[in-house]
Amino acid sequence: MFQKKLKQQQIVVKQSLPITPHELVYDNLSLLTAGLDEVGRGCLAGPVVAGAVILPDTISIDGLADSKTISSNRRYILAKKIYETAISWGIGVVWPKEIDEINILQASLKAMAHAATVLKTFPELLLIDGNKAIPQKFFIQFGWNFLPIQHSIIKGDASIPAISAASIIAKTFRDTLMSKLDKRYPQYNFSKNKGYGSKTHREILQKIGPSPIHRMTFKGVTSH
């Protein structure tokens, strides 16, 4: 009966949900919940990266918040605590070539599906930052035929600990990756701009053009 309720069910809401810190009560059942978020959506270069985190009910992590509001040093400290504390965590990555092929919205949703499907523990409920549900096709691509319930929450990364945690591990993973890519493409200063469209980054694009990891369909890249 419980599995029948969950199978292929997707729910999208655009307002705050009646949730406890780490779980949502649905039909009087306490569901194992994963928070999902993505980072790098607005970048001109590099992948979009998503995080998925299942936190325990018995342990809280002080300082969880939207990764954009936390200093870089603090993010890495929190990421370490998340890795140590989480029941399970996952990272999903979609690279620029595919971003250009399917568009950044679809790539962001696919990255979140990827992050969810690599969790070692199957989540019964996904709490997703934003206002979109993840299409079934992406879960199927990563081998899931049994789908969790989904709730999308606007600004969930600022209010839901599991989503905040997902945001933090995605951000630190991506920042570390961009610093590594800086060694391959040092002329673009990815270790500093992380692929975002800073003034200096745009000036570099104007002078030497894009690298193989730039998003060719993005206006900030193709306009140069």
From Swiss-Prot:
It is found in: Cytoplasm. One of its GO terms (molecular function) is RNA-DNA hybrid ribonuclease activity. GO terms for cellular component: cytoplasm; ribonuclease H2 complex. A divalent metal cation binds at D37, E38, D129. Manganese or magnesium. Binds 1 divalent metal ion per monomer in the absence of substrate. May bind a second metal ion after substrate binding. Belongs to the RNase HII family. PANTHER family: RIBONUCLEASE H2 SUBUNIT A (PTHR10954), RIBONUCLEASE HII (PTHR10954:SF18). SUPFAM superfamilies: Ribonuclease H-like. This is Ribonuclease HII. It comes from Lawsonia intracellularis (strain PHE/MN1-00). The lineage of its organism: Bacteria, Pseudomonadati, Thermodesulfobacteriota, Desulfovibrionia, Desulfovibrionales. Its cofactor is Mn(2+); Mg(2+). One of its GO terms (biological process) is DNA replication, removal of RNA primer. InterPro entries: RNase_HII (IPR022898), RNase_HII/HIII (IPR001352), RNase_HII/HIII_dom (IPR024567), RNaseH-like_sf (IPR012337), RNaseH_sf (IPR036397).
